[in-house]
């Protein structure tokens, strides 16, 4: 088993650095009698109080965003279009910044169960989007407020991407300058990246 990420991983790193550094890590969900996992290939950083695209812009504190003001490694799930999206809180308590997990490359041993969770979706469609990957992993709103360090969800060091590419975030129009922040990070060439064109897929993704 690869080394699990501990709270020290979040120390002395910015949210942007964390969004880059977890590319290639294995996201694991232990549920019932099986374990499902995949390698993170796409993330987005959300910079809290100063980021118009963040739920916590201007330090907005609501029932939904309350967990964003918690400690690093806390899990923030929310629903959008009947899908659950997965985020990790990144900064010290009181600073509501987070990283959204947008896409995974599933591990081989997880694919069969993931296909059942995704109602027989197969191939890249299995986990090439934030709502798809949570469904494949069996995550839900019940995971809101858990942490990566004392729950059935965790991160492990796993793969090293050949190139990490930074681009604009997806689905954040009309957010002023925040619309153009290059805060989406991908393992360049992965076929599991969301909104990917076939010509962008590469055979050389990991070191």
UniProtKB/Swiss-Prot annotation:
Gene3D superfamilies under this entry? Answer: Methylpurine-DNA glycosylase (MPG) (3.10.300.10)
Does the record's keyword annotation contain DNA damage?
yes
Major enzyme class:
hydrolase
The UniProt keywords, alphabetically, are: DNA damage, DNA repair, Hydrolase
An example GO biological process term is: base-excision repair
InterPro entries found in the cross-reference section: Formyl_transferase-like_C_sf, MPG, MPG_sf
Family that this chain belongs to: Belongs to the DNA glycosylase MPG family.
Tell me the NCBIfam families matching this sequence: 3mg (TIGR00567), PRK00802.1-2 (NF002002)
Q: What is this protein called?
A: Putative 3-methyladenine DNA glycosylase
């Amino acid at each position: 088993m690869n080394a699990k990420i501990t709270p020290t991983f979040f120390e002395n790193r910015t949210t942007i650095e964390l969004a880059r550094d977890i590319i290639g890590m294995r996201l694991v969900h232990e549920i019932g009698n099986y374990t499902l996992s995949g390698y993170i290939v796409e993330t987005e950083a959300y910079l809290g109080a100063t980021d118009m695209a963040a739920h916590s812009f201007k330090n907005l504190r609501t029932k939904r965003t309350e967990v964003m003001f918690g400690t690093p490694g806390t899990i923030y799930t929310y629903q959008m279009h009947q899908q659950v999206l997965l985020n990790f809180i990144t900064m010290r308590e009181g600073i509501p910044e987070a990283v959204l997990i947008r896409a995974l490359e599933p591990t081989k041993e997880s694919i069969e169960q993931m296909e059942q969770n995704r109602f027989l979706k197969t191939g890249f469609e299995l986990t090439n989007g934030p709502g798809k990957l949570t469904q494949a992993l069996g995550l839900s709103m019940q995971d809101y407020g858990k942490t990566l360090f004392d729950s059935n969800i965790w991160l492990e060091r796993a793969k090293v991407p050949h190139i990490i590419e930074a681009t604009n975030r997806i689905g954040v129009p009309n957010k002023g300058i925040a619309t153009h922040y290059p805060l989406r990070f991908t393992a360049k060439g992965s076929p599991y990246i969301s909104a990917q064109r076939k010509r962008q897929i590469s055979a050389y993704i990991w070191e």
